Amino acid sequence: MMNRSEMQKLGFEHVRYYTESPYNRGESSANVATTSNYYGEDEPYVEITLDIHDDSVSVYGLKSPNHRGAGSNYEDQSLLRQGRSGRSNSVLKRLASSVSTGITRVASSVSSSSARKPPRPQLAKLRRSKSRAELALKGLKFITKTDGVTGWPEVEKRFYVMTMTTNGLLHRSRFGECIGMKSTEFALALFDALARRENVSGDSININELKEFWKQITDQDFDSRLRTFFAMVDKDSDGRLNEAEVREIITLSASANELDNIRRQADEYAALIMEELDPYHYGYIMIENLEILLLQAPMQDVRDGEGKKLSKMLSQNLMVPQSRNLGARFCRGMKYFLFDNWKRVWVMALWIGAMAGLFTWKFMEYRKRSAYEVMGVCVCIAKGAAETLKLNMAMILLPVCRNTITWLRTKTKLSAIVPFDDSLNFHKVIAIGISVGVGIHATSHLACDFPRLIAADEDQYEPMEKYFGPQTKRYLDFVQSVEGVTGIGMVVLMTIAFTLATTWFRRNKLNLPGPLKKITGFNAFWYSHHLFVIVYSLLVVHGFYVYLIIEPWYKKTTWMYLMVPVVLYLCERLIRAFRSSVEAVSVLKVAVLPGNVLSLHLSRPSNFRYKSGQYMYLNCSAVSTLEWHPFSITSAPGDDYLSVHIRVLGDWTKQLRSLFSEVCKPRPPDEHRLNRADSKHWDYIPDFPRILIDGPYGAPAQDYKKFEVVLLVGLGIGATPMISIVSDIINNLKGVEEGSNRRQSPIHNMVTPPVSPSRKSETFRTKRAYFYWVTREQGSFDWFKNVMDEVTETDRKNVIELHNYCTSVYEEGDARSALITMLQSLNHAKHGVDVVSGTRVMSHFARPNWRSVFKRIAVNHPKTRVGVFYCGAAGLVKELRHLSLDFSHKTSTKFIFHKENF
């Protein structure tokens, strides 16, 4: 301790010692203050904070509590950092040397004090180092990128517009709107906090006060922002938070992050924080203690797996310098394109080549006929386009023969060279080819051939008389012929079907008036596509009465093109009708889940064999007898039931949910009906709507077993096929573990049955699976809660790495989500449950940094083929595909991207 004369030289009378040890630093709980109080409390003193760790002690802080001015505060953070590194100023050096003799006494005092008090409960897995805390301090933000960062000129402009009728005063209720903040509740609390800090009274502010408020909001200094945040709940400014204020801060954060479950459980979580920071039941906690808990690093339930050096090397490899030679850049780009798309390239080349060959053949054939002398090149073009139309009208049916494609991709090796994943896209490309062909064919006839026939003289027309009959001068006679009527009819019907099949109409993206809106959507697309029954009938008739051909019907080629595809497609439809009606399925369980999702558990027919990632069609005759809708199967192949999760969006799904919701409603007490739609607990068999299924059908995600490492990405309801894959991996892990246990048993060692070749081919290959599920609603995590918990219980070898992202929560590092992050770590450490998802899997906030995700996988798995499987909205497809190609080109890891048609 300093003697009195030494203290007087510095201008102070007493010294108060505060110690920091591993017990009270960020590695455990709140600070513990040990006071050496040799004189009266009213006399001046100096506070010295000592950092005691094992046998080492260092000065951590120095200040005069009785002198709060800027000149008397020695606890500047930069000064302390210098002091700890040997670069302190003279005052700190003198104090450090003077107190060195009292360090041992203080340390022993702290140890004895700690021994007398009951130890605070230690939370396993809650750890932070000072470096991580400093990073958190620098990165913590108060306002997100979308709230309040529009810039002062915009805020000022809005202020003047909003205060035109209020004499230049902005009311408290419109403060959030003025600064561009969406959360009204958060904006009101922010206004009150800033008003207290700036000593502003009343519920209105002028432009100068708003500018001061704006400076506080946009201040990049962490301390200022954190003080503002705590001022929002510490309304009496005493530096203490009681349980009610802690509850308010939790409610405030939950409201800003749209987390209704946390808001409803605010009392429980407030009690949890008080239990941690107020073990002696003083009834309050200090704000600085809550700051320590806020800075706890979120627990990581996964291993990073890469070092800084590897990460740096990879970053350097990804920065490929651009060649100045345009030829070299073009060649490299073409090389990458062919390498990534060679399956699509050869299929498209074959298709385009076939069309070009047919067009050229017919063009040259009619170039030599007498019709060329009358109608010229127009008839050659019309007949060439007609031949391509025959091919395309036949081929467009093949990509939608789902049973055939499923059999080919599952039972044959053709998937190695044929891009079955692009079957629907190829269907659309052929439709475009048909549109172009129809345009050329119809225009050539209507705008060129018919006018030339009318204008031809008798000698020119004579060779055409055997095809068209006596010459007519009326244009309408050609249009009203069988060929003309059937052709125009096909064009009209195809135009309707093609238009309603476009994304704008099929997904109701156009803002149409009420009456017109009813003729758009999936139902309009579904029913309009059935017009092709009429189209193909007209096509056969049109081909029978085709112009310029008078041979018998069996020598005409239209029916030859169509016969095989049409018969194949009709067989597909018959198989669907037969398969769905032979063995009916019963509903085992129904649940209406948060986020407008209907979960159905159905009995599994004995002959229904499928793979994870595949889908099936559902039909509910109570809604519509004709409509069949595809849904991914969420159960695993090893389960004894079938499950689907249906997002309620369109008319059909809304009616389906309404029907099942009626079944789930509780009956009056006298009817003795249990309030749950689970057949295992029913007192009687409920009257569920009849469900028919058809499938399974192949999908891109079913190929996950071809890869040892897979990256599964699901957006919202797009997680459904990925959940089936995760469940399948769990079942396989259980099977491998059970097999290992059997081999280790003495009985198994006595008799070991041989493994068949088929069993060897089905060996489980997946060694690592990364699952990223991104959803906006917190309630979405309830959909697959059981699966998430099962992963944490079963996956002892860490094969599956789960990442749940809730985008409604502000990004990590924002003050409004800092409370959620702290609460998340605290609750998970104590109860093993994540407060956001309600599962044992820790959730992340905002959206993933996909480049970092790919970078991490590339570092962890060099020279490996990684299967990337995505299902969700189309907005993310481009980014994931680009990253897959980019990392495949620039690293030794090859990412193979698969997109589910969603």
Swiss-Prot record:
Residues that, per the record, bind Ca(2+): D234, D236, D238, R240, E245
Topological category with respect to the lipid bilayer: Multi-pass membrane protein
GO molecular function: calcium ion binding; oxidoreductase activity, acting on NAD(P)H, oxygen as acceptor; peroxidase activity
Ferric oxidoreductase domain residues: 383-540
Domain of life: Eukaryota
Compartments, record wording: Membrane
Cytoplasmic side of membrane: 1-344, 402-428, 506-529, 731-902
Location of the region described as EF-hand-like 2 in the Swiss-Prot/TrEMBL record: 198-209
Region spans: Disordered: 63-87, 107-130, 738-760
Domain EF-hand stretches: 221-256, 265-300
Residue span of region EF-hand-like 1: 163-173
Protein role: Calcium-dependent NADPH oxidase that generates superoxide.
Family: Belongs to the RBOH (TC 5.B.1.3) family.
Record-given protein name: Respiratory burst oxidase homolog protein A
Organism name: Arabidopsis thaliana
Gene name per UniProt: RBOHA
